[in-house]
Amino acid sequence: MSQKSPVNDWFFKGYEAANGVYPVQAAYRMSQAILGLKAAVEKAMAKNGGKKPSTDELVAAMTGLEWQSPGGLIQMKLADGHQAIQPIAFSRTKYNPDLKRVDLVDIQYFAAECVNPPPGVKALDWIKGGMQGAKCN
C-alpha cells in the first residue's frame, strides 16, 4: 500500500519473489527498523572514525535522523527527535476472484505532517484543537 518509489519497488519485488506473496505491514515495519538501525550505525561510525558504535553513540545518531524506507521517508521528529513519523495510507479491500486474493483499492495517501501533531504538541490536544498546523496535500 506504500507509494511507488525505487526503494518500495525493490522491497516489494524481492519480498514477493522470496515468499510468493506480497509484503504486508509487519514486513514493512521490520524493514523500516533495520534500515533505520543501518542509517544510525553508519552515521555514528562516520562520526567516531569507523569504530563499532556504543549504545550512546547510536542513540545520538538516531536522534533527529531521517531515512528512506519501502514505506516512505521516516523522520525522527517528535519527542525531541526520539519518535518517528511517516506517511500513511488508507484503503478498502476487495476480493479479486481471478487471483483468488484480497486486493487493496481506493488507496489514499497522507503526508506524515498531515496525520501527526507538530513537535511539542500532544496528539489528543492537537485533535481536540482541530489539528492546527496539519500539512495536508
Which ranges hold each PLM region?
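Extracytosolic ligand-binding ectodomains
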Residues: 1-137
